From Swiss-Prot:
Homodimer. Substrate binds at residues 8-15, 21-22, 60, 87-90, 98, 114-115, 183-184. Gene3D superfamilies: Phosphoglycerate mutase-like (3.40.50.1240). This is 2,3-bisphosphoglycerate-dependent phosphoglycerate mutase. One of its GO terms (biological process) is glycolytic process. It comes from Nitratidesulfovibrio vulgaris (strain DP4).
Length: 250
């Protein structure tokens, strides 16, 4: 039976500041580093291991993975980095404070941008310096496939080819796999694995720094899945993710 561990990166500096991050490359906060180390201990306490790792091209996910590997003495484990595992691209919203954006545009509009399935955020133009076409890490990616702002639907369409081309073959070959990625790229994988419809995945919240363990049958269908550690903590962290972008109630 194949095992797959999905791990959202630890809290980033912009998670802490409640900003839309997307493809902006920010590092972990000190709390995020602690979350990554705690995730490693949860994996160790369960007696789990992994023989190959996948992550995005963004520092917060890469550093989370490296902290886990170091804590478990697994820095030698092969790592494959790919842009298709990057976070959803939030277009012109990237860098903006979520609550300030809700105050300016309305909480309902921000909710639609964040949580709807097929509505993209305001996009950025290809000549914008923040467009990924200007980032050397994507120099080998055809410019016409680099996003300027994505809906969750577009993120799913971007992520799933990597599942079929890279992650699934590793699992089918009998390798236990760790994927360290982002809230929305992991939502795309969970949608596929769990057979969620668009309404269900729009309500799904992935907490930072908590490993989600899948046991998969020979056809890569989930036999079981759960968050490692305290279920109440997973629920609390997921609620915190859901609350981002809501205005304070007086």
């Amino acid at each position: 039976m194949a095992r797959l561990i999905l791990l959202r990166h630890g809290q980033s500096a912009w998670n802490l500041e409640n900003r839309f991050t997307g493809w902006t490359d920010v590092d972990l906060s000190p709390a995020g580093e602690a979350e990554a180390l705690a995730a490693a201990r949860l994996i160790r306490d369960e007696g789990l291991d992994f023989s190959v790792c996948h992550t995005s091209m963004l520092t917060r996910a890469i550093r989370t993975l490296h902290l886990v590997q170091h804590e478990l003495d697994r820095l030698w484990t092969p790592v494959r980095k790919h842009w298709r595992l990057n976070e959803r691209h939030y277009g012109a919203l990237q860098g903006l404070d979520k609550r300030e954006t809700a105050a300016r545009h309305g909480e309902d509009q921000v909710f639609v941008w964040r949580r709807s399935y097929d509505v993209p955020p305001p996009v950025i133009a290809p000549d914008d310096p923040k467009h990924p076409v200007h980032d050397p890490r994507y120099a080998d990616v055809p410019p016409d496939v680099l996003p300027c702002g994505e809906s969750l639907e577009a993120t799913v369409a971007r992520v799933l080819p990597y599942w079929y081309d890279a992650i699934a073959p590793d699992l089918m070959a009998g390798r236990d796999v760790l994927v360290a990625a982002h809230g929305n790229s992991l939502r795309a994988l969970v949608m596929h694995l769990d057979g969620l419809d668009r309404e269900a995945v729009s309500r799904l919240d992935i907490p930072t720094g908590l490993p989600r363990l899948y046991e998969l049958d020979a056809a890569l269908r989930p036999v079981s899945y759960r968050y490692l550690g305290d279920p109440a903590e997973a629920e609390e962290r997921a609620r915190a993710v859901a609350a981002q972008g809501r205005l304070e109630k007086n």
